[in-house]
Swiss-Prot record:
Residues 1-21 are annotated as: Disordered. Pfam families: Glycos_trans_3N (PF02885), Glycos_transf_3 (PF00591), PYNP_C (PF07831). It catalyses: thymidine + phosphate = 2-deoxy-alpha-D-ribose 1-phosphate + thymine. This is Thymidine phosphorylase. InterPro entries: Glycosyl_Trfase_fam3 (IPR000312), Glycosyl_Trfase_fam3_N_dom (IPR017459), Glycosyl_Trfase_fam3_N_dom_sf (IPR036320), Nuc_phospho_transferase (IPR035902), PYNP-like_C_sf (IPR036566), PYNP_C (IPR013102), Pyrmidine_PPas_bac/euk (IPR018090), Thymidine/pyrmidine_PPase (IPR000053). GO terms for molecular function: 1,4-alpha-oligoglucan phosphorylase activity; protein homodimerization activity; thymidine phosphorylase activity. Pathway: Pyrimidine metabolism; dTMP biosynthesis via salvage pathway; dTMP from thymine: step 1/2.
Length: 471
């Protein structure tokens, strides 16, 4: 089922000429030069076989961050990363059905937990390779691991079986899949090179290229809690993702979505699983449901499984409302190690019953509105940073987390709020919130004196490949 990827051409092949030594490559990119294919492949080989020192990897990443890469360089880097490990192979009859979604990271972003089973209920095959929380953003794998027994490590053969029986699986990146990206990703996090368009593009698309997809939609976040606060910079990334995807023979679209407020009302691993289950019940926060339906509709339309984006969105909404998406989620839980009785209880139980089945923090503290006003914004970044400090996130790979730590936002953006009304409930294992943490959290609540308003959808725009016309 899984076969080793075709070994990349030798660094002396492609792009012309013999490969240059690493210091020369670093100097060339530092000074704004363009790297040949042979140079890029030589660098990736050196990362994998240990010839590249940590200092050289960091220097090259910083050179790329400061000087950028053109389309050709970014495409070559993406292919070289993808070819550094195994390629996943699926039955040819599945090709049109093989789809996925990726997010650049946000606060309260539990879309994958809902969207993957919803797409499976619509007839798709979703081999989703996800990540863990790092910094202030949550990780899909950590959220799922708050469910007792859920296993994110699945072999290619196990993934094939789950896709045959369920239609979706959500797994972690293994050492055999895109190992070069794993090394560069860890280095980017500690060298202040995360916010690089070519490096983000190559990292995302190399992982998705090995999945053997027909269609990918990337949720590119912008705003106060996103990698790119500015929508124009996020649009630059979206366009690069689409163009490199075309060069790889992959249909890639990018949705620009706002990440100023948390998505939904819950932040934290267990709390987000419970909110995802509400959405799978056909309920849940409107902004979460809206984003799931819009992203799912785009995927079904672009992959040719719906005639229009609206038709695709209607099918995803129906899967949420008729329970078929929730049934797929239950099957996925059982297939990935959760006791079938627990999986059934989680998916068919009430919110109160679900709360008794998942790990929760020992204490709760509520924060009160300091004044009257209209809720203009609940700033996601300071909220996420406090929860990170309380144990919901990790500062280094492998660090344990507290799945029950989190927060419930008790108000909606746009609503009228009276002084002394609870607006946030924090779940923590103790000790109590410090005065500084309380000040930071209270600073996340932005009040205004304008009239109440209805918050717009977080979905801002969709960047499509040139072969597909805007709806």
């Amino acid at each position: 089922m899984a076969a080793p990827g075709t070994p990349p051409p030798s660094a002396s092949g492609g792009g012309g000429g013999e490969p240059r030594q690493l210091p020369e490559l670093i100097r060339l990119k530092r000074d704004g030069g363009h790297l040949r294919e042979a140079d890029i492949r030589n660098f990736v080989h050196a990362v994998i076989d240990g010839r590249a020192q940590d200092t050289q990897i960091g220097a090259m990443l910083m050179a790329i961050r400061l000087q950028g890469m053109n389309l050709e360089e970014t495409s070559v880097l993406t292919r070289a990363l993808a070819e550094s490990g195994q390629q996943l192979e699926w039955p040819k009859a599945w090709h049109q059905q093989l789809v996925d979604k990726h997010s650049t990271g946000g606060v309260g972003d539990k879309v994958s937990l809902v969207l993957a089973p919803a797409l499976a209920a619509c007839g798709c095959k979703v081999p989703m390779i996800s990540g863990r929380s790092l910094g202030h953003t949550g990780g899909t794998l950590d959220k799922l691991e708050s469910i007792p027994g859920f296993g994110v490590t699945q072999s290619p053969e196990q993934m094939l079986h789950i896709l045959e029986e369920v239609g979706c699986c959500i797994v972690g990146q293994s050492a055999k899949l895109v190992p070069a990206d794993g090394i560069l990703y860890a280095a980017r996090d500690v060298t202040a090179t995360v916010d690089s368009v070519p490096l983000i593009t190559a990292s995302i698309l190399s992982k998705k290229a090995v999945e053997g997809l027909s269609t990918l939609v990337v949720d590119v976040k912008f705003g106060g809690a996103a990698v790119f606060p500015d929508q124009e910079k996020a649009r630059e990334l979206a366009k690069m993702l689409v163009r490199v995807g075309v060069s790889l023979g992959l249909k890639v679209a990018a949705a620009l979505t706002a990440m100023d407020n948390p998505l939904g009302r819950s932040v934290g691993h267990t709390l987000e699983v419970e909110e995802a289950l509400l959405c799978l019940d056909g309920a849940g926060p409107p902004d979460l449901r809206d984003l799931v339906i819009r992203l799912g509709g785009a995927i079904l339309w672009i992959s040719g499984q719906a005639e229009t984006q609206d038709q695709g969105a209607a099918r995803v909404a129906a899967a949420l409302d008729d329970g078929s998406a929730r049934r797929r989620f239950q099957l996925m839980l059982s297939a990935q190690g959760v006791d079938p009785g627990l999986a059934k209880a989680l998916c068919s139980g009430s919110p109160t019953q679900r709360r008794q089945l998942l790990p929760h923090a020992r204490e709760q503290e509520e924060l009160l509105a300091p004044a009257d006003g209209i809720v203009e914004c609940v700033r996601a970044l300071p909220l996420a940073r406090v929860l990170h400090d309380l144990g919901a996130g990790r500062s280094r790979a492998g660090q344990p987390i507290r799945p029950g730590v989190g927060a419930e936002v008790l108000v909606d953006v746009g609503q009228c709020l009276s002084r002394g009304t609870p607006w946030l409930r924090v779940h923590l294992d103790g000790p109590a919130l410090s005065s500084q943490q309380r000040r930071t959290l209270q600073g996340a609540l932005v009040l205004s004196d304008r009239a109440p308003f209805k918050v717009p959808s977080p979905f801002a725009e969709l960047v499509l490949p040139p072969t597909i016309a805007q709806p």
